[in-house]
Amino acid sequence: MQKTMTRHLSRNRKPHEKVSHVPRRGPRTYQDPCDPGWCVVNSCRRVAPQPIPTSGSLGRKPLNPGCPSRKWTEKIIAAPKHGFYSAKDHGYWVPKVKVQKKYNPLQKVVGGGKSYKDVLTTPATIQIKPTPESILLAQKIQNSTFKSRGKVTLSQEKIPLVNRFQELLIEKELMEEIEESQPFVANDPRAQHLICKKVPRKVGRREILVCPITNDESHLNLKSGIRAEIVDSMGSVVHAEKIAEYNRGHVVKSMRKRIVYERESKPIPIIGSFSDRAIRVSCDDHTDELASASSVPSEWKPSKNQRAVPCLLQNESGTVVSTKPDWYTPVKVCTHKQYMKVQRVFLDAMNIMRALRFHIDSKTLRETWVKCWLQVHKKNVAFPGWMIAPLLSGTVPCEQEFLLPRVNETRAFVTTCYA
């Protein structure tokens, strides 16, 4: 009956006739819902909640998403892995997730089975129900640039255990009055321009750049773009209006047509003024090197070979053990993502240290801080100046020491200049 009806309806229509229906296929068949097969999700997808009509029929009610309207047979249909939309069920058919088998303890067999020794020697499988904190912490550990090789251990009796996911309760009278000593939070306006990519939005006829998170207009002029120069092997940017300042006190490398000219050293600006990079590396001919955590005073680190004697290039081969200091190693140029990662770890570490500031004596704190950075530096990423300056000054940083630029500021990373 169905078939003949369909055939009758789908005769060749004359051009002026409206198409009143879509010829249906026969009923489609799916796997049994109890098997790991298909099930309907987000059933009854309506764009807006429709008003319930007061009179007349209520229309077809959406079917229960658990048991979709199909004649279940053993046939398996051909469908893409991600599922497909079914208008009849108002929802997507998706492959069912494999159900985890319930654990059934093995029945003891008198003859075979595990001996006590087997039981004791096999590792125990423990399942811990993850809490949001533990998940966050696990992710942080996975993503962190620290490796377990040289653990930074803090002595337990000195430091209270700090749950980083709760705010520390510290007595207010101990807190220093610092303008920006609040720790960084998600979408912190102080770091917005470091993190978010500006999005062009049309306002009238003008197109302006807008921060997608805070929605405020960028200070950049879209037509002329950003006027800035890349100044070192890290790809650090100095904005045009700061270039003079940068040139006043810094080693500059200019690369044109693949010729590396000699860098010229410029006189140092007055102490106390700000400049775009905190570190001055007085270097002769090594093109890409940066001061690193290794430039901290030697009493804070294990005394290895302190003499910084660069190897001669001819000398360098697999057999010769080089006595180069670790800052001599040419720096890998890291991607923006890696750089953001280092920056994230850095800010985290900084905030932890700042929180512990009142609980430990300064020496331990300083040592811990430096150890952290020696760890990160093993990954051989280049640090921009604002990260290293606090290390060189040998103190745990506070905001006066590296001034992260504010929301609408054009300057690149800025730090107090300790000449």
From Swiss-Prot:
Family stated for the protein in its record: Belongs to the nepovirus satellite RNA 48 kDa protein family.
In this chain, composition skew of type Basic residues spans 1-27
Q: What is this protein called?
A: Satellite RNA 48 kDa protein
Which residue spans traverse the membrane?
A: none
Where is the stretch described as Disordered? 1-29
Q: Which domain of life is it from?
A: Viruses
At the highest ranks, the source species' classification is: Viruses, unclassified Satellites, RNA satellites, Single stranded RNA satellites, Large single stranded RNA satellites
